[in-house]
Amino acid sequence: MLNKIQHRNLNTYSVTPFDFFEEFSRNLFNDFKPNFIKTDIHETDNEYLVEAELPGIPKENIQVTYENGVLTISGQQQIDAVNEDKKGKLIRSERSLTSVQRQYLLENVKEDEIKASYSDGVLKVTLPKDSNKEIKKSISIE
C-alpha cells in the first residue's frame, strides 16, 4: 500500500471552482516518472565534463555523438520478464522498452579529443575546449 501526501487548501475562504482541476491534475501526473537523463555539467578553463545518469542501460545501448556544437546522449533499455508456474505453463509475460535522449549545446570543443567512459550507471564525457576557435562575435549596428 502506498501512502500519498494529500495537499489541502488550509484557508477555507480562498477555495475556487478550479481547485478540483488542480487536485485532479496533481494526482494524475504525479505517478508518471520523467523520462529524461539527469545530468551534471562542469566547466573548467580547459574542458567540459558531462556526467549523465543512465542506470540499468547497458553500455552497448548508449550512443554519444557531437555535431555542430551539440552533444547528444541517447540510450535504450529493454526488459523482458517471463514468469512460469511449476509445470512450465506461461502465466505472465511482460515487456518494457525505455528510450532516453538529451542534447546539450557545448560549443568551442576539440571534436577529435572527446572521450567517454561508463561505469556504475554514470556516463562521463570529457570535451576539451578549443582555444583557437573564436567564441564571441562582434556585430556592428547600422
UniProtKB/Swiss-Prot annotation:
Residues 27-142 form the sHSP domain. Induction: Overexpressed in acid environments. InterPro entries: A-crystallin/Hsp20_dom, HSP20-like_chaperone, Small_HSP. It comes from the Bacteria. Pfam families: HSP20 (PF00011). Belongs to the small heat shock protein (HSP20) family. This is Acid shock protein. It comes from Streptococcus thermophilus.
